[in-house]
Regions:
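Short catalytic helix/loop segments, enriched in acidic residues and glycine
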Residues: 18-45
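Short glycine/proline- and acidic residue-enriched helix-loop micro-motifs
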Residues: 28-36, 122-142
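Short beta-strand scaffold positions
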Residues: 66-67, 146, 167-168
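Short, hydrophobic/glycine-enriched beta-strand segments
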Residues: 1-7, 166
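Acidic, low-complexity terminal tails and accessory targeting/binding regions
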Residues: 1, 101-115, 178-247
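Glycine-rich phosphate-binding loop signature in dinucleotide/nucleotide-binding domains
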Residues: 55-59, 155-162
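Phosphate-coordination/substrate-recognition cap region in phosphate-metabolizing enzymes
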Residues: 2, 11, 16, 43-123, ...
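Short, conserved phosphate/pyrophosphate- and ester-handling motifs at nucleotide-, phospho-/glycolipid
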Residues: 6, 41, 169
């Protein structure tokens, strides 16, 4: 199973501009769900598709699942278009449980904007920590994990013994790691603190039977940038999503 964060989006670019200029709001003219890939993000997705296509056919994805957010759907579609899956592969199948973490009243605010416009939320987050803090109308990491557990149950039920590619978002990748590697809060936040998940970076798991013949996930690689480094049309980016806050 592969977990891939979407390519660079127009929202990633807008967030950087807003933060650099000290603005409180991120200038995005659409809903977060409708934010597309940037031109670089499209090249990143194409490069990743070509990287998958270079694998032997019996090592390529057989099923592609994607978040309903446009940037994830575009990434998944471009990977498939570049031949990154087996012929006749299923998908991209859209699953709303793979969507971005919902930020509620903090949506489109920069870190400085949160401090200035919602100081109570900044204080509450500092007290609870980013794992459990749930902004009004939004989700905590723990909330995201709850829906991802059900998504994994569905994958096990309908796609057992198939190679599955999941195209999603930064926090979703980290929350999948939390579940699959049986992490605790401290462990997953330590991974997060090491740096952002790369746009189109590859996280790969193999599932191997244990002594009780249950399939146990083993992390093969995390945040692999090689597909982008090897392609002249793309470059590596690791920009935070629209709202992340301090680590």
């Amino acid at each position: 199973m592969w977990l891939v964060r979407h390519g660079q989006s127009a929202g990633n670019v807008a967030r950087d501009l807003a933060s650099a200029s000290g603005r409180h709001m991120i200038d995005i003219p659409t809903r977060d769900v409708d934010v597309p890939l940037s031109e670089l993000g499209r090249r990143q997705a194409d490069a990743l598709g070509r990287w998958f296509s270079a694998l032997p056919e019996d090592e390529r994805p057989e099923v592609v699942l994607a978040s309903p957010y446009v940037r994830a759907r575009e990434t998944a579609a471009r990977i498939c278009h570049e031949g990154g899956v087996v012929p006749g592969a299923k998908g991209p199948v859209i699953d709303e449980r793979l969507r971005e973490r919902e930020f509620g009243i903090l949506d489109r605010l920069t870190t400085e904007g949160i401090r200035q416009l919602h100081p109570d939320q900044a204080e509450h987050r500092a007290l609870l920590g980013k794992f459990y803090h749930r902004p009004p109308g939004g989700e905590s990491w723990a909330d995201v994990i709850l829906r991802l557990r059900t998504a994994l149950d569905t994958i096990s039920l309908h796609h057992a013994d198939r190679r599955v590619l999941i195209v999603c978002h930064q926090v979703v990748v980290l929350c999948f790691r939390y579940i699959l590697e049986e992490m605790d809060e401290e462990a997953v936040l330590r991974v997060d603190k090491e740096g952002d998940v790369l746009n189109c970076g590859v996280c790969e798991y193999e599932f191997e039977p244990d002594d009780e013949r249950e399939c146990v996930p083993r992390l093969v690689r995390y945040n692999l940038a090689a597909p982008l480094i090897e392609d002249e049309q793309a470059k590596v980016t690791a920009e935070p999503d629209v709202i992340t806050g301090t680590r």
